[in-house]
Structures are given as C-alpha cells and as structure tokens.
C-alpha cells in the first residue's frame, strides 16, 4: 500500500 494524505497506510 502507499501513504495517504492522513499519513496512514492505504492498505490498512
């Protein structure tokens, strides 16, 4: 997964 604007893992 990649980093989203919230700083979390998009894959999560």
UniProtKB/Swiss-Prot annotation:
GO terms for molecular function: toxin activity. Keywords: Disulfide bond, Neurotoxin, Secreted, Toxin. Its main location: secreted. Expressed by the venom gland. Contains 3 disulfide bonds. The keyword Disulfide bond applies. GO terms for cellular component: extracellular region. It is found in: Secreted. Belongs to the CRISP family. Venom allergen 5-like subfamily. Shows similarity with the venom allergen 5 from wasps. This similarity may explain why patients with allergies to centipede venom also display allergic reaction to wasp, honey bee and/or yellow jacket venom. This is Scolopendra 20466.84 Da toxin. It comes from Scolopendra viridicornis nigra.
């Amino acid at each position: 997964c990649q980093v989203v604007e919230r700083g979390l893992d998009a894959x999560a």
